[in-house]
Amino acid sequence: MTLESPSTRLMTCQSSLLPEKPRFLSQKMWAPHLVVAYLIFVTLALALPGTQTRFSQEPADQTVVAGQRAVLPCVLLNYSGIVQWTKDGLALGMGQGLKAWPRYRVVGSADAGQYNLEITDAELSDDASYECQATEAALRSRRAKLTVLIPPEETRIDGGPVILLQAGTPYNLTCRAFNAKPAATIIWFRDGTQQEGAVTSTELLKDGKRETTISQLLIEPTDLDIGRVFTCRSMNEAIPNGKETSIELDVHHPPTVTLSIEPQTVLEGERVIFTCQATANPEILGYRWAKGGFLIEDAHESRYETNVDYSFFTEPVSCEVYNKVGSTNVSTLVNVHFAPRIVVYPKPTTTDIGSDVTLTCVWVGNPPLTLTWTKKDSNMVLSNSNQLLLKSVTQADAGTYTCRAIVPRIGVAEREVPLYVNGPPIISSEAVQFAVRGDGGKVECFIGSTPPPDRIAWAWKENFLEVGTLERYTVERTNSGSGVLSTLTINNVMEADFQTHYNCTAWNSFGPGTAIIQLEEREVLPVGIIAGATIGAGILVVFSFAALVFFLYRRRKGSRKDVTLRKLDIKVETVNREPLTMHSDREDDTASISTATRVMKAIYSSFKDDVDLKQDLRCDTIDTREEYEMKDPTNGYYNVRAHEDRPSSRAVLYADYRAPGPTRFDGRPSSRLSHSSGYAQLNTYSRAPASDYGTEPTPSGPSAPGGTDTTSQLSYENYEKFNSHPFPGAAGYPTYRLGYPQAPPSGLERTPYEAYDPIGKYATATRFSYTSQHSDYGQRFQQRMQTHV
């Protein structure tokens, strides 16, 4: 805005007061008047240089939010007169109170030249250009623009507060911010996250100042958007923080289905449970099940249970769930383990020599199968694929081929397919055949090749025959599925027939085939030999069976003899002492047997026969380690000790029983009676002068009469107290250790830990004997045995 000086305005005002020069008057007539006016103006301007009126502060552009207070300043210097404000050129009035404008008033000190315009509760109508004028001084201020900002009156999302949408169908969310000045800006949020891509437009209202903003956000709802909150925020300079409004989505969608199988891997024939888990909005109305595209009747629940077969591996099971919106179908295959099943069968093939042949065989199995092609009667694998390719085939390639499928740990299956190769006849009979002299014989000629032979002829010696009978010879032809058989039958086979070669020749369209067959004699065993061998084998079987029965019987009988006598209340204490020398006078053996001995014999008599029987069946080998073991072999049941004084009571002495024959090392096998029967075993040995130990041991002779049988002998009495010995040289009789000879012969020399020969080899056995663990070579033998029955 250009400021005008007071002199300039005055001149303008004065010039406007001058009358307009008539057009018809000449310029000379007005010249004096112009000069006078000019002189007056100059006089006035020069007369008032210090009292010039001017604006010290003029109104400026302002921006105010609707409802707020606005003040437009206006300050004049050297002026006392009327001041008024104009709004868009319209005078608001004079004075401080503007009655026509209740929200407007002039404020400030007039003495200070302040004529400020105050506007309270600014409205859109206050949005205008304002000017301050000093009327008497003919002064006008520059124009000030007052801009009133209007926030959006309303922010709204179409369709709220809940918008029902269809899953998968695109939809535009529309937000509107009404009557804002300036136009509002709209921002979208999805669950608090700002969204991009909205399209915004504005509409100008009729007042030309306010605008409505429209924003559209394109979404494609899914079932996951159910309950999702979208927020629209509108803002402008009047409301920097903006206004918000929100809506919630309700998405209708077809069922969302998950189909599961339990168990996931099964064998053919096992039971499987299908479970169809579904969520939908609105609610689910029902279920439908199908297999391989065919509806399964009576299956209308979320679970379907059935026994599976191999078809479930290739034909899917589907579950369809539906509601008002639509339906969802989910399918699955079952991992069924099953044996191979053929899909494409191999076909018999006939071809010519030199052609290429392809044999096809297709299997299915689970787990993945292994496929092999082999030729019959051969283990060579020709192919591992569904097809077997044979190039330039010959008649040797003809035959039966096997297509075998293997499913590990499940099963094996195979199919056979014949391959026929056209060619001359091939005779596959044995070159040497057999017959029995004097009986009827047959010579066979078999042709299995293709095509079948048209003619088959036999030739031998000077004879030729295709079919029929010639003397003793007859030819017959038989057709079968595998080929043609021509049989030459010979009646009453003779020696000359074994010296003849038989020629079998066959013809077909590809040529002839020939085979030479030799007939040999078959040896026939006489009927007597066959019958004898049969009878002998039968007898052998019978005897073997009888021996087995006898063996089992004896084992069972032996186990029954191991019994324990528990009810007899008999206690026998036996003390044996043997001095270094023996008495010379001994009483009769039968007289020396005490009453206790007879009692013991009576007790053991029931076992005597069985002991004698088993005596020859046992042979105990002395273990030299027992010599140094201190453990009681009876586990405490028998108290056998050496170097102990005899008790004063219940002592029974027994005479020594001695065989009259040559003395020898007597290591007889122990009794059959085991420890479980409750009876001890005490090994005893014959005694003789030291000189007798050098003789070669001989088998025992018969026992001396008068009670010399030592089988019931328990101990020997020490006759040292009688100072007499029954044998010459008894004073030098060496001590011995029970169970071991003191001075073994040269053939029996052993180290302390070296095993002796079997005891039964040199001596007989004495029942109820044990070796004393404490007897030594240099001390007197002393044995004490307590028996509790």
UniProtKB/Swiss-Prot annotation:
Comp. bias (Low complexity): 694-712
Cytoplasmic-side positions: 553-789
PTM field: Phosphorylation probably regulates the interaction with NPHS2. Phosphorylated at Tyr-637 and Tyr-638 by FYN, leading to GRB2 binding.
CDD domains in the record: Ig, IgI_2_KIRREL3-like, IgI_5_KIRREL3
Record note on what altering P633S does: No effect on interaction with NPHS2
Swiss-Prot/TrEMBL GO biological process terms: cell-cell adhesion; cell-cell junction maintenance; glomerular filtration; positive regulation of actin filament polymerization; renal protein absorption
Signal peptide extent: 1-47
Residues covered by region (Disordered): 687-713
In-chain residues carrying the UniProt-annotated modification Phosphotyrosine: Y637, Y638, Y654, Y657, Y756
Record membrane topology: Single-pass type I membrane protein
Glycan attachment residues as annotated in the record: N78, N172, N329, N503
Coiled coil (UniProt feature): none
Topological domain spans for side Extracellular: 48-531
Phenotypic consequence of Y637A: Inhibits interaction with NPHS2
Keyword Cell membrane: yes
InterPro entries referenced in this protein's UniProt entry, alphabetically: CD80_C2-set (IPR013162), Cell_adhesion_signaling (IPR051275), Ig-like_dom (IPR007110), Ig-like_dom_sf (IPR036179), Ig-like_fold (IPR013783), Ig_I-set (IPR013098), Ig_sub (IPR003599), Ig_sub2 (IPR003598)
Disulfide bonds: C74-C132, C175-C232, C276-C319, C361-C403, C445-C504
GO cellular component term of the entry, any: cell-cell junction
Keyword Mitochondrion on entry: no
Motif (Cell attachment site): 437-439
Function, in words: Required for proper function of the glomerular filtration barrier. It is involved in the maintenance of a stable podocyte architecture with interdigitating foot processes connected by specialized cell-cell junctions, known as the slit diaphragm. Is a signaling protein that needs the presence of TEC kinases to fully trans-activate the transcription factor AP-1.
Family (UniProt): Belongs to the immunoglobulin superfamily.
Subunit architecture: Interacts with TJP1/ZO-1 and with NPHS2/podocin (via the C-terminus). Interacts with NPHS1/nephrin (via the Ig-like domains); this interaction is dependent on KIRREL1 glycosylation. Homodimer (via the Ig-like domains). Interacts when tyrosine-phosphorylated with GRB2.
Protein name according to UniProt: Kin of IRRE-like protein 1
Species per Swiss-Prot/TrEMBL record: Mus musculus
Gene that produces this protein: Kirrel1
